[in-house]
């Protein structure tokens, strides 16, 4: 997804793309194990007068939203990312593709957020679906 050349896609558009990916995967004739990655920088701005900007609170709230309220994240306007978290933070909308592909209910099993000496916040979140847990329980019982 291109977020470099404006206009950037909205979070809602990316979230809905993820839902379409979920539908495509579920329509497959075979039982598949699928891993979906969402990538992109967290809060950061590497140029201009605000170079070096990192907004840890914005990042943590975004990670919270991925687990608990992705619909609210999908409604964040692109200009909010730019204003509150730096012009490169628009990359976060790409994480919403992953989240849309996971469906409504997820379990957060891992989270990491770090602001290194560089000017880009780093984050990672691992979410698992209820379907994954059901498959895992079925394999363990067999």
Regions found by a protein language model. Give the residues of each.
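Flexible, D/E/H-enriched segments
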Residues: 1-19, 27-30, 48-142
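A structural signal for small-residue-enriched, beta-sheet-centric alpha/beta enzyme cores
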Residues: 40-48
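Catalytic-core regions built around general acid/base machinery
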Residues: 24
């Amino acid at each position: 997804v291109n977020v470099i050349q404006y206009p950037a896609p909205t979070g809602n558009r990316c979230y809905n793309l993820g839902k379409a990916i979920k539908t495509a995967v579920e329509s497959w004739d075979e039982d598949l194990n699928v891993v979906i990655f969402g990538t992109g920088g967290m809060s950061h701005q590497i140029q201009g007068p605000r170079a070096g900007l990192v907004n840890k609170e914005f990042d943590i709230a975004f990670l919270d939203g991925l687990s608990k309220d992705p619909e609210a994240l999908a409604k964040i306007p692109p200009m909010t990312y730019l204003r509150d978290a730096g012009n490169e933070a628009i990359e976060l909308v790409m994480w919403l593709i992953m989240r849309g592909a996971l469906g409504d209910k997820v379990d957060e099993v891992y989270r990491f957020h770090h602001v290194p000496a560089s000017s880009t916040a780093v984050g990672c979140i691992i979410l698992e679906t209820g379907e994954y847990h059901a498959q895992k329980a079925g394999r363990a019982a067999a």
